[in-house]
Amino acid sequence: MSKRYRESENDEGPSSTGTKKTKSSDGPLSKYTHGDYTVGWVCALSKEQTAATAMLDFRHGDLPKTSSRDPNTYILGSIGKHNVVIACLPEGEIGNNVAATVATHMISAFPSMRVGLMVGIGGGIPPKVRLGDVVVSTPVGEYPGVVQWDMGKATEGGSFQRTGALNKPPSSLRTAIGRLKTEQELTGSQIPQYLDQMAKRYPNLAPKYLRSDSLKNILFKAGHGHISKAATDSEAAPDENSTEEAYDDDEEDDEDEEKEACRFCDKSQIVKQTPRDMRIHYGLIASGNRVIKDAIFRKKLNKDLGGQVLCVEMEAAGLMDGFPCLVIRGICDYADSHKNKAWQEHAAAVAAAYAKELLQYVQPDDVDGERPVKDLLKQG
């Protein structure tokens, strides 16, 4: 029997609740080999990697490094009938180029890898997309699912023309999306159940990674910039930062940020939204090397791309050509000046849960039919 379909001696079996438990990899090395892993899962932040690891059905033991020049650390396990390798960008580093480097090392270390998932958080484009929703990259018109919005050239008249084209997600993953959509329409998504399982297996994750009443879905009108505390508690000033702030800001402000986000902002400028459940959206993701924290710029970018953008993020474009992957983003902010970290863990969890659900419908034979990613790199 293929190692894809059996449990390792280091794997922990199903729990009494019927869900499979993961196990720490502090024990002996895995009985699997580097050639047994076909699905690569890339995260940008450690909180995204935490959510990904929590979604594994089984945790495998570690494997020895294949190269001393590979700086990545890998978390190994399985979801359904697929062996999965998870890697995260180095702490404090973000962007397309860093993501591409991590993926390149992963591909070299795991020669049988055929498909990839880029799973994590992103900024949503309102009004269609809301906090806590999931956006999945799928081809739209001339775009393959992800467009690098900051790659191009200046043209006559001062306009900006985007150049180059990225690859579409692997066909085995796109085929599975069609089946998943049907099953979700018939019986609903399994994401809530996967989140409940995560909370039972890892209770310490529940306070941040599950949605709670403390998470407020607040959208301000585009013309109302964030008002932050100035030098004294009695003063307030507009936040002039626009696009130069990374997702992980200074830790010292986290506690105040979550408790007092938009404390000084004009509440009359909040857009009224009818309450609804989490939704999954399929379409265009705009990727660039700068964090977007400006509602006016967000609207212009969406308009320039035909009004088709659902999400903005920073890593996907660096992967799409050399690492055939599907990009899955949980929405944690609206890419405006009111951006804060409150929703990040929950957004990471729903994105990881969607990836887990999708893999249930990805056929192993279809994955085996994809060309090894290392061969695609050699061809390129």
Segments from the language model and where they lie:
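Intrinsic-disorder/coil detector with helix-boundary
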Residues: 2-380
